[in-house]
Amino acid sequence: MNQPESANDPEPLCAVCGQAHSLEENHFYSYPEEVDDDLICHICLQALLDPLDTPCGHTYCTLCLTNFLVEKDFCPMDRKPLVLQHCKKSSILVNKLLNKLLVTCPFREHCTQVLQRCDLEHHFQTSCKGASHYGLTKDRKRRSQDGCPDGCASLTATAPSPEVSAAATISLMTDEPGLDNPAYVSSAEDGQPAISPVDSGRSNRTRARPFERSTIRSRSFKKINRALSVLRRTKSGSAVANHADQGRENSENTTAPEVFPRLYHLIPDGEITSIKINRVDPSESLSIRLVGGSETPLVHIIIQHIYRDGVIARDGRLLPGDIILKVNGMDISNVPHNYAVRLLRQPCQVLWLTVMREQKFRSRNNGQAPDAYRPRDDSFHVILNKSSPEEQLGIKLVRKVDEPGVFIFNVLDGGVAYRHGQLEENDRVLAINGHDLRYGSPESAAHLIQASERRVHLVVSRQVRQRSPDIFQEAGWNSNGSWSPGPGERSNTPKPLHPTITCHEKVVNIQKDPGESLGMTVAGGASHREWDLPIYVISVEPGGVISRDGRIKTGDILLNVDGVELTEVSRSEAVALLKRTSSSIVLKALEVKEYEPQEDCSSPAALDSNHNMAPPSDWSPSWVMWLELPRCLYNCKDIVLRRNTAGSLGFCIVGGYEEYNGNKPFFIKSIVEGTPAYNDGRIRCGDILLAVNGRSTSGMIHACLARLLKELKGRITLTIVSWPGTFL
């Protein structure tokens, strides 16, 4: 009988506004005068609290807008596309106007005072008889802080509701503002992250006195516990996806295109993050394209494109350019392309991905994923000498979620650090040129390196490899929720071998009846889904003319039909030529054979390979197949860019001539949002840069091309060939 009564108990009074409301709601105030419409939030229809400005010119409460954008991706007023990271805190002037709004004391039976909104909390603590009557004075508040970290006069903590946004959860878990929006920087007055919508909605930014350090520390632990609770409830964003699915069911009769939540701001730049993807159908397509692999200068597996109707798009957290480091605990940070594809194609209802997003402001190096390590206390000194102040050291620096400091993510082949030979991946950088970085950031470390003239003095802590699996592997459960062998019961990830691809040209004369179909389906062609591809055979009909002949196979590239070249023609033109033939047809084709390395049939990799072999009807060309085509089949395009005001073209390149590895093409590894390359829209991750202003890049070393791109002014013409990534 007591439980229903306690469930109906009123919410505790808030020590900031004096009203009874839950932790997930904004403060309530009574305004004796009408508030100007420009100072009203058009989501809650109340005066603005902690206002955020959108790029389209509207202003909302931080808490209101954050919760709105969890399920939507547009501005509530004009429905223009909107993400939280593009919003900025309103100006100091707007905040001052809001703080000066007159409010009445809510305890009217004890106090009738009218005062400015920013003074109400101080009024409760010092001179309000009503606040003293209800226990909201300073002494009572201090005693109740352990029960209500946000200042509510309650002796019991209130758990956050499932509606708390995932963005708010991430904000509660860290005291470090994101790199994407410098406006979200916590101030000394706040004592907490400025981007935390729950806490910012629960406190006044202009309170007259700062918090005590012990109070801030206590609140931090409370925030972490609340954040973990919400993450368990939302199952890493699956609840959001379910809301989107329900919305689609309710809008089946509408003609508007489906819009999925844009939650990619939940993955921080420059940090290794694990996410959980749920699928009802274990074999449902991810609807993404992948490029990269250890056989290419890209090294990593990178998302090139995300289709709007797939699992990844519904999840909403990943972006093109994100690097996939692990798949269900299997390390793919340095494996061949097809090996990673096999792992990603393995059916599972729960897919764990460990990913990393490139930082917007970073040293332009590629990287590899660190393994699990056990730290040691010893350290050593490394002195690197640059040939010029502009030369890069050839290391990529990242932070870790579970450890403070700066870590080396990768040592780039051929760079200064690589030639020196002392630095290794996952080394912790303790200091640079005497500056302590034990609790520093990769950005500050990069700044110190760039500011060095010639000599860079690093203090580094070496760590030893720890033989331990991932958390979910150690627990003995696989991605389907069933028991799997422990680490001692099966071997570690084998080192995959690189496949070999050969091209063989052939001429085939086929006889058929005049009205008989050839029995094959072709794809590709000029402007084929934004990629200019050769015409290739995507399937052969069993029992048809081509199938009976047996010489033209799925995957063959058609070069010529009865003397007519098929290069640079559209698919419809190629189909018309194939249908025009009578009783005899001569096909010139390029047969592309891919030989996978022989593996032990009992190894996990071999089992995965056999399990995930796509049937012929589902065959699609892999990205590495396109790379092996002869140059005559390249459909190159010229892209003209102009530098922005910051002087950057906005893309990162890897590859080039190396003394020990020979000549390799230059690949586009990443593209920075808001730059000329990004705004042009035609450059993708995995594209090959063939020439700059007509000058071939073949045979260039990386430093030479980087210097050339940096020094060129005005119009810059890039000659690029773009191949579609492997579809999953």
Swiss-Prot record:
<protein>
    <recommendedName>
        <fullName>E3 ubiquitin-protein ligase LNX</fullName>
        <ecNumber>2.3.2.27</ecNumber>
    </recommendedName>
</protein>
<dbReference type="GO" id="GO:0060074">
    <property type="term" value="P:synapse maturation"/>
</dbReference>
<dbReference type="InterPro" id="IPR017907">
    <property type="entry name" value="Znf_RING_CS"/>
</dbReference>
<dbReference type="Pfam" id="PF00097">
    <property type="entry name" value="zf-C3HC4"/>
</dbReference>
<feature type="domain" description="PDZ 2">
    <location>
        <begin position="381"/>
        <end position="464"/>
    </location>
</feature>
<keyword id="KW-0863">Zinc-finger</keyword>
<dbReference type="GO" id="GO:0030165">
    <property type="term" value="F:PDZ domain binding"/>
</dbReference>
<keyword id="KW-0833">Ubl conjugation pathway</keyword>
<keyword id="KW-0677">Repeat</keyword>
<dbReference type="InterPro" id="IPR001478">
    <property type="entry name" value="PDZ"/>
</dbReference>
<dbReference type="GO" id="GO:0006511">
    <property type="term" value="P:ubiquitin-dependent protein catabolic process"/>
</dbReference>
<feature type="short sequence motif" description="NPXY motif">
    <location>
        <begin position="181"/>
        <end position="184"/>
    </location>
</feature>
<dbReference type="GO" id="GO:0042802">
    <property type="term" value="F:identical protein binding"/>
</dbReference>
<dbReference type="InterPro" id="IPR001841">
    <property type="entry name" value="Znf_RING"/>
</dbReference>
<dbReference type="GO" id="GO:0098794">
    <property type="term" value="C:postsynapse"/>
</dbReference>
<dbReference type="InterPro" id="IPR036034">
    <property type="entry name" value="PDZ_sf"/>
</dbReference>
<dbReference type="GO" id="GO:0016567">
    <property type="term" value="P:protein ubiquitination"/>
</dbReference>
<feature type="region of interest" description="Disordered">
    <location>
        <begin position="475"/>
        <end position="494"/>
    </location>
</feature>
<dbReference type="InterPro" id="IPR051342">
    <property type="entry name" value="PDZ_scaffold"/>
</dbReference>
<keyword id="KW-0808">Transferase</keyword>
<keyword id="KW-0963">Cytoplasm</keyword>
<keyword id="KW-0479">Metal-binding</keyword>
<comment type="function">
    <text>E3 ubiquitin-protein ligase that mediates ubiquitination and subsequent proteasomal degradation of NUMB. E3 ubiquitin ligases accept ubiquitin from an E2 ubiquitin-conjugating enzyme in the form of a thioester and then directly transfers the ubiquitin to targeted substrates. Mediates ubiquitination of isoform p66 and isoform p72 of NUMB, but not that of isoform p71 or isoform p65.</text>
</comment>
<dbReference type="GO" id="GO:0098686">
    <property type="term" value="C:hippocampal mossy fiber to CA3 synapse"/>
</dbReference>
<feature type="region of interest" description="Interaction with MAGEB18">
    <location>
        <begin position="186"/>
        <end position="244"/>
    </location>
</feature>
<keyword id="KW-0597">Phosphoprotein</keyword>
<feature type="zinc finger region" description="RING-type">
    <location>
        <begin position="41"/>
        <end position="79"/>
    </location>
</feature>
<feature type="domain" description="PDZ 1">
    <location>
        <begin position="274"/>
        <end position="359"/>
    </location>
</feature>
<dbReference type="InterPro" id="IPR018957">
    <property type="entry name" value="Znf_C3HC4_RING-type"/>
</dbReference>
<dbReference type="GO" id="GO:0004842">
    <property type="term" value="F:ubiquitin-protein transferase activity"/>
</dbReference>
<dbReference type="GO" id="GO:0008270">
    <property type="term" value="F:zinc ion binding"/>
</dbReference>
<feature type="domain" description="PDZ 3">
    <location>
        <begin position="507"/>
        <end position="593"/>
    </location>
</feature>
<comment type="pathway">
    <text>Protein modification; protein ubiquitination.</text>
</comment>
<feature type="modified residue" description="Phosphoserine">
    <location>
        <position position="441"/>
    </location>
</feature>
<keyword id="KW-0862">Zinc</keyword>
<dbReference type="Pfam" id="PF00595">
    <property type="entry name" value="PDZ"/>
</dbReference>
<feature type="region of interest" description="Disordered">
    <location>
        <begin position="178"/>
        <end position="214"/>
    </location>
</feature>
<dbReference type="GO" id="GO:0005737">
    <property type="term" value="C:cytoplasm"/>
</dbReference>
<dbReference type="InterPro" id="IPR013083">
    <property type="entry name" value="Znf_RING/FYVE/PHD"/>
</dbReference>
<comment type="subunit">
    <text>Interacts with the phosphotyrosine interaction domain of all isoforms of NUMB. Interacts with MAGEB18 and MAGEF1. Interacts with the Coxsackievirus and adenovirus receptor CXADR. Interacts with endogenous retrovirus K protein Np9. IGSF5/JAM4 interacts with isoform 2 through the second PDZ domain, other isoforms may also interact with IGSF5/JAM4.</text>
</comment>
<feature type="domain" description="PDZ 4">
    <location>
        <begin position="638"/>
        <end position="724"/>
    </location>
</feature>
<comment type="function">
    <text>Isoform 2 provides an endocytic scaffold for IGSF5/JAM4.</text>
</comment>
